[in-house]
């Protein structure tokens, strides 16, 4: 193996702004397969760490793959430090996790990482399920999120169903959802962005609610009827990018929502079942 060693000058190492930890598909536009190109469109460097590697989402007639083994997963994280690729790291974002043990491994890595990066932004999308489908991850994942990742996160982006699971509270109206979100806030967890909150069905609107200790901001967007998958992953990619580019939280959330709508409409125009990213106009 030593005879193959070519690259040992760590001063030449590529540097990441963001490490994105979530699913990856060979075919399609979910998880890091949509998040990475979206983040790169924003001019940021991102390293993708897969939690599951799948042929495609389960919404097709064939489906292959599964969770990354713990040994591989921990090795992927460790290798980023061994390559000295995290000197300029600014954020870690997480999405779909394959197993509870991955969540524990990730939390241990993040805890160690924060010693060298005390200002690191950790944003967790606690992917658990939704109102229509119920829980679609392994049953021990919600508790793993509560125990290991939520205490480390500065911000989280649950949907209404996930907020209910994490808090044990009914969140089917706006006031109860806000109260549940506020119950999660702590010295570390500064904000909760509730995605897919109740909106005005008659006016074809959906709401995203930004909850902090000091404020609540309800952002309404047009509702697009579609079965497209990966919109939540795209939203989080745009949100973390906006925050790192200096946007205030409410502005970053608003812009992320607008970008998701733009991508959905563009995809529909091109008659695709998988998200297609149009060029990003500078704002």
Curated annotation (Swiss-Prot):
Its cofactor is Mg(2+). Keywords: ATP-binding, Kinase, Magnesium, Metal-binding, Nucleotide-binding, Transferase, Zinc. One of its GO terms (biological process) is pyridoxal 5'-phosphate salvage. The keyword Transferase applies. One of its GO terms (cellular component) is cytosol. Mg(2+) binds at residues 136, 162. It comes from Escherichia coli O17:K52:H18 (strain UMN026 / ExPEC). Belongs to the pyridoxine kinase family. PdxK subfamily. This is Pyridoxine/pyridoxal/pyridoxamine kinase. Homodimer. SUPFAM superfamilies: Ribokinase-like. The keyword Zinc applies. It holds the Pfam family Phos_pyr_kin. B6-vitamer kinase involved in the salvage pathway of pyridoxal 5'-phosphate (PLP). Catalyzes the phosphorylation of pyridoxine (PN), pyridoxal (PL), and pyridoxamine (PM), forming their respective 5'-phosphorylated esters, i.e. PNP, PLP and PMP.
């Amino acid at each position: 193996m030593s005879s193959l060693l070519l690259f040992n000058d760590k001063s030449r190492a590529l540097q990441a702004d963001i490490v994105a930890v979530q699913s990856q598909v060979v075919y399609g536009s979910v998880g890091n397969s949509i998040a990475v190109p979206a983040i790169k469109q924003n001019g940021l460097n991102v390293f993708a760490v897969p939690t599951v590697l799948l042929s495609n989402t389960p919404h097709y007639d064939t489906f292959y793959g599964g969770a990354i083994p713990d040994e591989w997963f921990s090795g992927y994280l460790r290798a980023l430090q061994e390559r000295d690729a995290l000197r300029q790291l600014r954020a870690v974002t997480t999405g779909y996790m394959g197993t509870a043990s991955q969540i524990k491994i990730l939390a241990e890595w993040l805890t160690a990482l924060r010693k060298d990066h005390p200002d690191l932004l950790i944003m967790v999308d606690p992917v658990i399920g939704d109102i229509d489908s119920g829980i679609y991850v392994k049953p021990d994942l919600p508790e793993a999120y509560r125990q290991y990742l939520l205490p480390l996160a500065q911000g989280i982006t649950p949907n209404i169903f996930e907020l209910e699971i994490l808090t044990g509270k009914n969140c089917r109206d706006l006031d109860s959802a806000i109260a549940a979100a506020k119950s999660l806030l702590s010295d570390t967890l500064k904000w909760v962005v509730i995605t897919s909150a109740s909106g005005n069905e008659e006016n074809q609107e959906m709401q995203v609610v930004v909850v902090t200790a000091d404020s609540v901001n309800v952002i309404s967007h047009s509702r697009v009827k579609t079965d497209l998958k990966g919109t939540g992953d795209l939203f989080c990619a745009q949100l973390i990018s906006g925050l790192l580019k200096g946007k205030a939280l409410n502005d970053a959330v608003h812009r992320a929502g607008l970008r998701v709508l733009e991508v959905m409409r563009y995809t529909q125009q091109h008659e695709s079942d998988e998200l297609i990213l149009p060029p990003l106009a500078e704002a």
